[in-house]
């Protein structure tokens, strides 16, 4: 498995997501009981409570699967050791389209990390921008395509391990 397939998480983020997963799993019997209670109310075709409970169950099961996959593929607390190369877990600074004044600083990681201060944007290594920057060295320019179809050039100014 390569680093771009691995989700880098801080210890705090991992613990928060694990607690959410544990809560959702613990809630399974409650949802099942709710569905059974609603089923006993009669005709299922006209039973809004039953359908709402089934909908909630589906949403919670989808979130459980998402969290399990995320946590199973997580690298916890292992920020890249090296500076100067954009890797998952790096805080990078870039400038756009040869305009050195148009800069942005962000973490290459996952929004699930919930960077606590809220001041640092997070771009997934699977996003167009994050993916374009993976393995870029300081001073290197890369291009990526935005959803509108336009191509944007970005140059890596700095890359440092995240110390959250």
Swiss-Prot record:
The gene is greA. Belongs to the GreA/GreB family. PANTHER family: TRANSCRIPTION ELONGATION FACTOR GREA. It comes from Mycolicibacterium vanbaalenii (strain DSM 7251 / JCM 13017 / BCRC 16820 / KCTC 9966 / NRRL B-24157 / PYR-1). NCBIfam families: greA (TIGR01462), PRK00226.1-3 (NF001262). GO terms for molecular function: DNA binding; RNA polymerase binding. The keyword Oxidoreductase does not apply. GO terms for biological process: DNA-templated transcription elongation; regulation of DNA-templated transcription elongation. InterPro entries: GreA/GreB_C_sf, TF_GreA/GreB_CS, Tscrpt_elong_fac_GreA, Tscrpt_elong_fac_GreA/B, Tscrpt_elong_fac_GreA/B_C, Tscrpt_elong_fac_GreA/B_fam, Tscrpt_elong_fac_GreA/B_N, Tscrpt_elong_fac_GreA/B_N_sf. Necessary for efficient RNA polymerase transcription elongation past template-encoded arresting sites. The arresting sites in DNA have the property of trapping a certain fraction of elongating RNA polymerases that pass through, resulting in locked ternary complexes. Cleavage of the nascent transcript by cleavage factors such as GreA or GreB allows the resumption of elongation from the new 3'terminus. GreA releases sequences of 2 to 3 nucleotides. Signal peptide: none annotated. SUPFAM superfamilies: FKBP-like, GreA transcript cleavage protein, N-terminal domain. This is Transcription elongation factor GreA. Keywords: Coiled coil, DNA-binding, Transcription, Transcription regulation. Residues 11-76 form a coiled coil.
